[in-house]
A protein has these predicted regions:
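A structural micro-motif recognizing beta-strand termini
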Residues: 30, 44-46, 60, 82
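C-terminal structural segments of small proteins and small subunits
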Residues: 62-99
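Short alpha-helix capping/helix-loop boundary micro-motifs
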Residues: 39-43
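N-terminal first-folded block
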Residues: 1-37
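A generic local secondary-structure boundary/capping motif
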Residues: 14-16, 44-46, 66-69
Length: 99
């Protein structure tokens, strides 16, 4: 799994039938210091994440192992909304800004 910040949404009115009713998010991969590290990623949203939230996402075959993405042509899926993380017993991120 990888860390990312949700930076936008993607709307598609015409798509492959198995992708109907999926919400898509635009993600930017980040490191544990919240610095952007990669390209943009389009991911199906399995958890109801919103713009500005930090999330965990998976790609490849792992992305197709959620109930929502099973048997669907998804290459990336948001699997969790991050509340906080600690490294070496130091709080590095808190969703509500306490870090």
């Amino acid at each position: 799994m990888l860390l990312a910040k949700v930076v936008g949404t993607l709307v598609s009115t015409r798509k492959e039938q198995t992708l109907e009713n999926l919400k898509f998010l635009v993600l930017k991969q980040i490191d544990t210091d919240q610095k952007e590290t990669g390209a943009y990623v389009i991911a199906a949203d399995a958890v109801g994440a919103g713009v500005g939230e930090i999330v965990l996402y998976a790609t490849g075959s792992s992305a197709r192992q959620t109930v929502m993405t099973d048997r669907r042509p998804c290459d990336a899926v948001v699997m969790a909304i991050v509340d906080l993380w600690e490294i070496d017993e130091e709080l590095k991120f808190h969703k509500y800004g306490h870090a």
